[in-house]
Amino acid sequence: MKESKNKERRKEIQYIDAHLDEEVEAMRIMIENTRPGAEHPELGYKPRKRKPKYIREHGKRRTIYMPEIHEQWLHHIIVLILEPIITATAYPYSCGSFPGRGAHYAKKRLVSWIRRGKGIRNFAKIDIRHFYESVRIEILMRELTIRIKDEWFLHVIRVCLIGFKKGIPLGFYISQWLANYLLEPLDYFITVTLGFQITERYMDDRVIMDDNKKRLHTAIAKIKQFLGQRFRLKLKRTWQVCKFWYCKGKRIVKGKEKRWIIGREIDYMGFLFSRERTGIRKSIMLSATRLAVRMEKQKERRQGYFKRHIEAMLSYIGWFSCTDTYACYYFYIKPFVNVGKLKKIISKLDRRANQNERMETGTVRTAA
């Protein structure tokens, strides 16, 4: 099963695999009784109050809700129905959470537009303010009813979101799909109504490119109005319209060749895009080099590495491998860490954790 991939060592997964027929039948009964006017509503899906977890990611504090295994099953069943509905009409360059459309896909697409060199004189960078936390459930359900007419299916989705009056919960498998569904009208508005062809969205983060800067400013004003009227959402105040980076010429200053740079690079998804190369955001690069030095000091003291440091370093290696930053890796990362050794350590730790980990229980469900 997709939702139990790489979790076969967990005892609850082993139990479910051993009693798969009974579990599937119990799930069927639960779904059949999760409908308006069900014959046995006491057998339906009843989510309990979930305890949030807090993580820090890219300098932001995020609230995560972890569903238990049967709740994950229900989410995957919902996505099996939602996925063909959403992907059939989704904008081809809306990335993030779509299969095969991750950050690397988005990066490759944007780089191809830049290399083509047409219609990229200026760019606009916009982001929706607290998108997941600001989505109103009643507005989400209203948008779903536009294309989905099955009251039973809509009721199951609504029950999954009980306890969240405002905001789509991070950590739910259905959340990323619901978010993409909700933003699809915005994609249509920008590409068809406003007529921008060079635009890409990574979740709620978007880049629009055009030769006319005034046209970009007008578009942002209309996007603000569209988001407010239809979804009651706002753009972050950090939106920007800038001339895209290019080298206007070269000159010799004190015997050294210096380039005359006009405009800015596009800071998007943690990458820095220019016409000549793709780099990494300065904060990410500094964090990676500082962590490498810290791990080297731990090694000199004959201390073990922290698991979170190993995971972070392997993540940073991924950034260096897909950008034009090998020189930074060669001088500031490679001398201090052995990537192969780190991979072996984390693999061993993950196997050990899977043997002992227990997933949280939080859903009341009566077996058949």
Task: List where the protein language model places each region.
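Conserved pre-motif C helix in the palm subdomain of viral-like polymerases
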Residues: R61-A90, K165-T193
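Right-hand nucleic-acid polymerase module
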Residues: P67, Q72, H76, G163, ...
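Conserved polymerase palm-domain catalytic core
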Residues: V111-M203, V207-G228, L235, E265, ...
